[in-house]
Amino acid sequence: MSWLFGIKGPKGEGTGPPLPLPPAQPGAEGGGDRGAGDRPSPKDKWSNFDPTGLERAAKAARELEHSRHAKEALSLAQMQEQTLQLEQQSKLKEYEAAVEQLKSEQIRVQAEERRKTLTEETRQHQARAQYQDKLARQRYEDQLKQQQLLNEENLRKQEESVQKQEAIRRATVEREMELRHKNEMLRVEAEARARAKADRENADIIREQIRLKAAEHRQTILESIRTAGTLLGEGFRAFVTDWDKVTATVAGLTLLAVGVYSAKNATSVAGRYIEARLGKPSLVRETSRISVLEALRHPIQVSRRLVSRPQDALEGVILSPSLEARVRDIAIATRNTKKNKSLYRNVLMYGPPGTGKTLFAKKLALHSGMDYAIMTGGDVAPMGREGVTAMHKVFDWASTSRRGLLLFVDEADAFLRKRATEKISEDLRATLNAFLHRTGQHSSKFMLVLASNQPEQFDWAINDRIDEMVCFALPQREERERLVRMYFDKYVLKPATEGKQRLKVAQFDYGKKCSEVAQLTEGMSGREIAQLAVAWQAMAYSSEDGVLTEAMMDARVQDAVQQHQQKMQWLKVERPDSQTNKPPHPSLLSC
């Protein structure tokens, strides 16, 4: 059984290290220090020992020694021993690796500490350098300040020195001027005294010289008067005695007077003739009649106007069907009147503003092949006393037209008011009488067309001179839609398709949009619809990309509707009937 514990074995076996000794008992050392009562007796130590286990172990060892598997058991024990040794060696290697890792960690920590130390030293050096630089800068700034203070002190001293020198120089100059003034005063005083003394001594001689000069001057004037009188008397005597010279002189003066007055009157007559034939009266604002000056300024336009053919009277004019038929009859009758050289009829066109009265008057003149002239009633009152003469000039000028003239008086109620009830000036009353005098009979030279928003204010004599009354009412739904389409095409679509202007139109249903606009613009006139189309064009031009969108059109329509409502509110406030809650006069809104 000795081989089991590795004591007696063959060579080469059991070469492992001896088993470690069991640790000493805590009470083994220093046991003498304890008391006698603490040390157990040998009898007590082995009294509870059970030898059964040792017996079983000895028995197992004997069986194993006599067993045939003893070698395998020994090999197994050796392998276990080798395994334990390998485990001990691996633990030793791990311990060595841990030691090496600890050393490397120490080296890393030392390197990190060294790096931190170097960084701190570098920072300290930088801080020290910055502090030294700061001190150097402060020293330099202090030097600059000291130098600046020194320079300022030197400059102040120099200025004080200059001021002192200037004060000394000024005092010197003043003293010099004072002395010079004193010397000058003394010299003048001496000269005055000397001159006074000389005058006193030469007083008799001076008086004699003055007396001689006055006598000589008097003698010269008397001789000049005698000579001039003698010459004039002899000349007049010679002229009177010669009757041929007298007759020639009288005839010459007479002819000169006759020539001056004749030239003056002839010039006045020629001027009035030229003004009546070639010029344009001051009351006429616009006319299609061609003048010599206009022909010289615009020959191409004048030639085109001369060769132009009569146009349709309702081209570009949108009216209701009944009104369109009536005005077309008036246009046809006017054209036939011109062809037959008959008498023209006077027409009154009344209705709200912006319904096409002026436009139809122009188209009527072009359709009939006549010239047109437009005058405003508001221009008559400011002329005062010249109004009568200006009114006669207008009718004289209209009577000289070879093609016939359509005289359109816009805002005629401004000066054709009732003479009995209205308070008008004497000059305006005289102008009205002149107008009534010139329109008392029908004429084959001109046709009178009056336009008014308040026809009830006309004088009764004016109503008596009117042959045809036409009411231009506000456009209805169909007329508004036609107007919207026409102006949308004129101011939006045509500029966008021509490509010459910065205007584009977004993609949407134009016809549907025009119908919606016509529905929203109820109560608006044709002029307001045209202004709305112009506002669309302006909004497209003012946008960033130059594109007119449907939203932009809707916004402008809403603004136009609000403005129209505000105008109607103002109209109700301005009308006298608003105090009694009565509606405005029908001529201001519709027919």
Swiss-Prot record:
Gene3D superfamilies: P-loop containing nucleotide triphosphate hydrolases (3.40.50.300). Residues 55-216 form a coiled coil. The modification N6-acetyllysine is found at residues 490, 494, 512. It holds the Pfam family AAA. This is ATPase family AAA domain-containing protein 3A. It is a single-pass membrane protein. Residues 31-47 have a biased composition (Basic and acidic residues). GO terms for biological process: antiviral innate immune response; DNA damage response; HRI-mediated signaling; mitochondrion organization; negative regulation of apoptotic process; negative regulation of PERK-mediated unfolded protein response; regulation of cell growth.
